[in-house]
Regions:
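Structural alpha-beta junctions
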Residues: 34-43, 109-120, 209-219
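Short, surface-exposed beta-strand/loop "edge" segments at domain boundaries and coil↔beta transitions
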Residues: 21-27, 93-98, 127-128, 260-263
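Aromatic/basic-lined ligand-recognition segments
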Residues: 126-290
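N-terminal low-complexity, intrinsically disordered segments
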Residues: 19-77
Length: 301
């Protein structure tokens, strides 16, 4: 069965900086905090709908940061308790994707750095890690754009299924939180057994990368009944050009689970269960690669 997705003419992306003091002249902080040519690109958009800056005391802020999470719990706590919220928002035509959200996020990071604040991705509800200065050509989805993280191991110890049982449980449900700003539906995969959580995560990552180019083309797009995911798709997710596996493409089936949300399933012809497919049919690298150091030129292959 085919799936049709509708890419909007415009999308909105937003970030916030949680800070402990009034930031003063935001535009000046941005100009000083970004390297060229990124700084020049940002300066050309400041004050337009493509890059708007606002500042609010936390008590009257339009953004609720009280449930922000992140890999660094100290940063997450600081974000939840900060007295000031600086918003970086953008309304973007499809032609400005994915560079527009990239510029907005770089702006938020520059403001956070100047104020010793904490940048927050409003789509994912997570803090943004400190990384090297962003470059115009430095966009890749692996750089914290999907908001998808693995759950606590074995459901925080509550899962009692045998680890060697391929289909022993269905504890894991994963979903993206961030594709909407690229004009795309969010993706989810559910009923995954604990031992296959990383493979399921990498299937979501690769599917997201496969769909990403559609976000630049407004209108209806009818996808085939089964989408073919290639080694090049997984490589591009990491910002890499080297092959990540040697075999052919992986077929996945997409389903319309809800408005703006697609489910990812095994191909219809696969005779077994989701977990058997995750275990038996995927390249080994999808079971192995969780992340890599962003300072490196390429992920391990």
């Amino acid at each position: 069965m085919h799936v049709t997705i509708t890419v909007p003419e415009e999308t909105t992306a937003g970030f916030a900086v949680a800070a402990d003091r009034d930031p003063g002249d935001l535009a000046a902080k941005v100009r000083r905090g970004l390297p060229r040519p990124l700084g020049a690109a940002v300066a050309g958009h400041l004050g337009t709908p493509q890059l708007m800056l606002t500042c609010h005391p936390a008590g009257s802020s339009p953004w609720n940061l009280s449930e922000v999470t992140g890999d660094d719990e100290d940063d997450a706590l600081r974000a939840r308790q900060a007295g000031w919220h600086i918003g970086v928002t953008c309304v973007l035509p499809a032609s400005d994707l994915p560079s527009g959200p990239h510029l907005a996020r770089a702006t938020a990071k520059a403001i956070a750095d100047s104020l010793r604040g904490v940048p927050v991705d409003l789509a994912t509800g997570r803090t943004l890690p400190a990384t090297r200065p962003d470059r115009l050509d430095d966009f890749f989805l692996a750089d914290d754009w999907l908001g998808t993280v693995l759950p606590p191991y074995r459901n925080s110890g509550r899962c009692t299924a045998d680890e060697d049982d391929i289909d022993g449980c269905a504890c894991v449900a994963l979903s993206t939180r961030g594709l909407g700003r690229f004009g795309l539906p969010e993706l989810e995969i559910t009923d995954v057994a604990c031992p296959h959580d990383l493979a399921a995560l990498n299937i979501l990552r690769t599917t997201a990368q496969r769909l990403l180019p559609l976000g630049r083309h407004p209108g209806d797009h009818t996808l085939p009944g089964e989408l073919l995911l290639t080694s090049a798709d997984f490589s591009a997710f990491w910002g890499n050009r080297d092959p990540m596996w040697d075999d052919g493409p992986i077929a996945v089936r997409l389903t319309e689970n809800a408005s703006g949300r697609l489910g990812v399933l095994p191909p219809a012809a696969f005779p077994g269960t989701l977990n058997e497919w995750l275990w038996d049919e995927l390249p080994p690298v999808l079971h192995e690669l969780l992340g890599w150091d962003l300072e490196r030129a390429a992920p391990p292959g």
